[in-house]
Regions:
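Active-site regions of metal-assisted phosphoester/phosphodiester hydrolases
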Residues: 1-130
Length: 130
Protein backbone atom coordinates (compact mmCIF):
# COMPACT_ATOMS: atom_id res chain seq x y z
CA UNK A 1 0.00 0.00 0.00
CA UNK A 2 1.13 3.52 -0.75
CA UNK A 3 -0.15 6.76 0.75
CA UNK A 4 0.26 10.16 -0.85
CA UNK A 5 -0.81 13.34 0.92
CA UNK A 6 -1.86 15.90 -1.68
CA UNK A 7 -2.28 19.60 -0.88
CA UNK A 8 -5.46 20.81 -2.59
CA UNK A 9 -5.86 24.54 -2.00
CA UNK A 10 -4.51 24.26 1.53
CA UNK A 11 -6.41 21.07 2.43
CA UNK A 12 -4.73 17.69 2.66
CA UNK A 13 -6.24 14.86 0.66
CA UNK A 14 -4.93 11.42 1.67
CA UNK A 15 -4.78 8.98 -1.25
CA UNK A 16 -4.15 5.30 -0.51
CA UNK A 17 -3.22 3.09 -3.47
CA UNK A 18 -3.61 -0.61 -2.71
CA UNK A 19 -2.89 -3.92 -4.38
CA UNK A 20 -4.11 -6.61 -2.02
CA UNK A 21 -2.91 -10.19 -2.22
CA UNK A 22 -4.70 -13.03 -3.92
CA UNK A 23 -4.43 -15.45 -0.97
CA UNK A 24 -7.32 -15.15 1.50
CA UNK A 25 -5.13 -15.13 4.63
CA UNK A 26 -2.83 -12.49 3.17
CA UNK A 27 -5.82 -10.36 2.12
CA UNK A 28 -7.43 -10.74 5.56
CA UNK A 29 -4.28 -9.39 7.25
CA UNK A 30 -4.01 -6.57 4.71
CA UNK A 31 -7.69 -5.66 5.13
CA UNK A 32 -7.35 -5.37 8.91
CA UNK A 33 -4.19 -3.31 8.54
CA UNK A 34 -5.86 -1.04 5.98
CA UNK A 35 -8.93 -0.53 8.20
CA UNK A 36 -6.63 0.46 11.09
CA UNK A 37 -4.74 2.95 8.94
CA UNK A 38 -7.93 4.49 7.57
CA UNK A 39 -9.32 4.90 11.10
CA UNK A 40 -6.17 6.68 12.36
CA UNK A 41 -7.37 9.90 14.03
CA UNK A 42 -3.98 11.52 13.50
CA UNK A 43 -4.59 11.50 9.74
CA UNK A 44 -7.23 14.20 9.39
CA UNK A 45 -8.94 15.28 6.22
CA UNK A 46 -10.63 13.40 3.40
CA UNK A 47 -9.33 10.00 2.32
CA UNK A 48 -9.54 8.02 -0.91
CA UNK A 49 -8.65 4.33 -0.96
CA UNK A 50 -8.40 2.83 -4.40
CA UNK A 51 -6.78 0.07 -6.38
CA UNK A 52 -6.82 -3.67 -6.91
CA UNK A 53 -8.60 -5.27 -3.96
CA UNK A 54 -8.62 -8.77 -5.52
CA UNK A 55 -12.22 -9.21 -4.34
CA UNK A 56 -14.99 -9.71 -6.84
CA UNK A 57 -17.57 -10.57 -4.20
CA UNK A 58 -18.19 -9.02 -0.80
CA UNK A 59 -15.20 -10.13 1.21
CA UNK A 60 -13.55 -9.01 4.43
CA UNK A 61 -11.96 -5.92 2.90
CA UNK A 62 -15.23 -4.77 1.36
CA UNK A 63 -17.07 -5.38 4.63
CA UNK A 64 -14.49 -3.54 6.77
CA UNK A 65 -14.16 -0.54 4.47
CA UNK A 66 -17.91 -0.24 3.87
CA UNK A 67 -18.47 0.35 7.59
CA UNK A 68 -16.10 3.35 7.57
CA UNK A 69 -16.23 4.70 4.02
CA UNK A 70 -18.47 5.27 1.03
CA UNK A 71 -18.01 3.03 -1.98
CA UNK A 72 -18.22 4.33 -5.52
CA UNK A 73 -21.06 2.62 -7.35
CA UNK A 74 -19.52 2.19 -10.79
CA UNK A 75 -22.87 1.21 -12.32
CA UNK A 76 -23.90 4.89 -12.12
CA UNK A 77 -21.12 5.79 -14.54
CA UNK A 78 -20.71 2.80 -16.83
CA UNK A 79 -22.52 -0.29 -18.07
CA UNK A 80 -19.67 -2.70 -17.43
CA UNK A 81 -17.72 -2.43 -14.17
CA UNK A 82 -15.26 -5.17 -14.97
CA UNK A 83 -11.59 -4.25 -14.90
CA UNK A 84 -9.67 -7.54 -15.03
CA UNK A 85 -8.09 -8.94 -17.13
CA UNK A 86 -7.39 -5.89 -19.24
CA UNK A 87 -7.79 -7.48 -22.66
CA UNK A 88 -11.24 -8.95 -21.99
CA UNK A 89 -12.39 -7.93 -18.50
CA UNK A 90 -14.65 -10.43 -16.72
CA UNK A 91 -14.04 -9.51 -13.04
CA UNK A 92 -14.60 -6.36 -11.00
CA UNK A 93 -11.50 -6.29 -8.78
CA UNK A 94 -10.74 -2.58 -8.72
CA UNK A 95 -12.63 -0.32 -6.36
CA UNK A 96 -12.72 3.23 -5.01
CA UNK A 97 -13.68 4.08 -1.42
CA UNK A 98 -13.77 7.58 0.05
CA UNK A 99 -14.82 9.68 3.02
CA UNK A 100 -15.00 13.31 4.00
CA UNK A 101 -16.39 16.07 1.86
CA UNK A 102 -15.62 14.43 -1.44
CA UNK A 103 -17.90 14.21 -4.45
CA UNK A 104 -17.39 11.89 -7.39
CA UNK A 105 -18.18 13.79 -10.60
CA UNK A 106 -17.30 11.21 -13.20
CA UNK A 107 -15.60 7.83 -13.59
CA UNK A 108 -14.45 6.07 -16.69
CA UNK A 109 -12.45 3.02 -17.64
CA UNK A 110 -9.55 3.78 -19.98
CA UNK A 111 -9.34 1.26 -22.76
CA UNK A 112 -6.25 2.12 -24.72
CA UNK A 113 -3.22 0.30 -26.05
CA UNK A 114 -1.01 2.13 -23.56
CA UNK A 115 -3.25 1.06 -20.66
CA UNK A 116 -3.09 -2.58 -21.77
CA UNK A 117 0.69 -2.43 -21.93
CA UNK A 118 0.98 -0.76 -18.50
CA UNK A 119 -1.15 -3.22 -16.52
CA UNK A 120 -3.15 -6.43 -16.62
CA UNK A 121 -6.11 -4.34 -15.37
CA UNK A 122 -7.88 -1.54 -17.19
CA UNK A 123 -7.52 1.68 -15.17
CA UNK A 124 -10.38 3.49 -13.48
CA UNK A 125 -10.10 7.27 -13.76
CA UNK A 126 -12.22 9.39 -11.41
CA UNK A 127 -12.91 13.11 -11.32
CA UNK A 128 -13.25 14.01 -7.65
CA UNK A 129 -14.29 17.31 -6.13
CA UNK A 130 -13.34 18.44 -2.62
Amino acid sequence: MQRADVDVNGRLLHVYNVHLGTAILERRYQAQRLATLVADRHVTGPKIILGDFNEWMRGLTTTLLSTKLKSVDLSQYMKRRRTYPGLFPVLHLDHIYYDGDLEIDHIEVLRSRRALIASDHVPLVADIRI
